[in-house]
Structures are given as C-alpha cells and as structure tokens.
C-alpha cells in the first residue's frame, strides 16, 4: 500500500514531508536570534545574498541602515570593534569577506540627506561623491586576514571626519538613498575649515 501511495501521489507525499520538516527548521533558526520575526527576514535576505550567483541586488534603505548605522555602545576605538560588528551585522559579500567597511555613528535620515549635498571627488577612481557638511564619528574596517567567511579578520580605525558617499535612485520610494560609503575623511589637524567650494582654508 505504501508503494502504491508513493507511485500514485508523489506530490502529495512531498508536501506532507515538507510540512513535517518545516517546524524543525524554524525552531533551529529561532534559537540563534532574539527577535524571530525581524531577524528571520534579515536571515532570509542573508541566505539569498549568500547563494546568489548573479549580480548583487541594489541596496535598500533597510540594508544600508542595518549594515552601516551604529548606536553608542562598544567604544569606537576598541581594537576588535570591526571583527565583532561585521559578524553581528552579517557584513559579507556572498561567501567572501568585504575588503573594507565603514560604520557611522549617526541617524539614517542624516546620512540620506547627504545624497542632496554638493558633489566632490572621491577615492578609488569614483568621480562623484556627496560629502557631509559636518564631522561624523565612525569606524573604518580594513581586512587583514582570510578572504572567506567566517575567518575574516579586520583592523579597526576610529575616525572623525567628513563622510563621502555615493547614492542611487530607488524607484519604490522615489528618492535617492545612500549606496556606498566611499570614505570618512579626517580634516587636517591644524586650524582650518571647509569653504563653500569644498576647499580646506587654513587659518593663520
């Protein structure tokens, strides 16, 4: 009879098996996260990005906010800041470590406003970046060991400077959103200020 059931109703049997296994899978995932509903969405997105073989999906507000924005807690000058935060926030590119990353101590809305500031040159051959008008505290992470997760090791650098970002248009919300944090430029240590043209003016 079992053989007849398998041969005549294979799809039904597969669906029943899937339903039986589903609670076990969710129970295992829930033990890793404190707030299941919010974290499950993040976990699904992470798995999708991890397994993706095509182009990386464009960033969303939620993804940028989760990966870049930080709140007061661990001292920003702590030497293991990047190692802990990158693991906690799942900052990876598919199965590889990111070579560099920035964490910013600011509100997402303030970061988004930078997209409408004037253009300035930025590093790594990128021609146009938007620069913050004020100084922002953050941490720069530079990969020092390994290239595949979970063995990524980073050196952490505390910075207080002007944020340079690139932005992209998001059709769903009809506005510019931050795309990439290009740099966090520390001002010269002598007395100076930025004029309206984005040039450092040194005071006598």
Curated annotation (Swiss-Prot):
**Which parts form a coiled-coil structure per UniProt?**
none
Q: Name one GO biological process term.
A: defense response to Gram-positive bacterium
Query: What range does the record give for the signal peptide?
Result: 1-26
Record's CDD domains? Answer: RNase_A
Q: What is its main location?
A: secreted
Question: What is one GO cellular-component annotation here?
Answer: extracellular region
Q: Which InterPro entries match?
A: RNaseA (IPR001427), RNaseA-like_dom_sf (IPR036816), RNaseA_domain (IPR023412)
What are the protein's GO molecular function terms? nucleic acid binding
Sites of glycosylation?
130, 142
Give the intrachain disulfide bonds.
97-152, 115-167, 122-129
Q: Which UniProt keywords apply?
A: Disulfide bond, Glycoprotein, Secreted, Signal
> Where is the protein found, in the record's own terms?
Secreted
Instruction: State the similarity comment.
Output: Belongs to the pancreatic ribonuclease family.
PANTHER family from the UniProt entry:
INACTIVE RIBONUCLEASE-LIKE PROTEIN 9, RIBONUCLEASE
Its function, per the record, reads:
Does not exhibit any ribonuclease activity.
Per its record, how is this protein called by name? Inactive ribonuclease-like protein 9
User: What organism does the record attribute this protein to?
Assistant: Macaca mulatta (Rhesus macaque)
């Amino acid at each position: 009879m079992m053989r007849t059931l398998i041969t005549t109703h294979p799809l039904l049997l597969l669906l029943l098996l899937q339903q039986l296994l589903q609670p076990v899978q969710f129970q295992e995932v829930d033990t890793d996260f404190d707030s299941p509903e919010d974290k499950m969405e993040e976990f699904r997105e992470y798995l999708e990005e991890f397994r993706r073989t095509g182009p990386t999906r464009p960033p969303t507000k939620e993804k940028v906010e989760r990966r870049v924005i930080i709140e007061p807690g661990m001292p920003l000058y702590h030497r293991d800041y990047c190692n802990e935060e990158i693991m906690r926030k799942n900052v990876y590119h598919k199965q590889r470590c990111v070579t560099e990353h920035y964490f910013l101590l600011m509100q997402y809305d303030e970061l988004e406003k930078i997209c409408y500031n004037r253009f300035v040159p930025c590093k790594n051959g990128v021609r146009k970046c938007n620069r913050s008008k004020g100084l922002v505290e953050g941490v720069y992470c530079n990969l020092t060991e390994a290239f595949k997760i979970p063995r990524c090791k980073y050196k952490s650098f505390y910075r207080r400077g002007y944020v340079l970002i690139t932005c992209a248009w998001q059709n769903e919300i009809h506005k510019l959103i931050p795309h990439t944090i290009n740099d966090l430029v520390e001002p010269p240590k002598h007395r100076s200020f930025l004029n309206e043209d984005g040039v450092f003016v040194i005071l006598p």
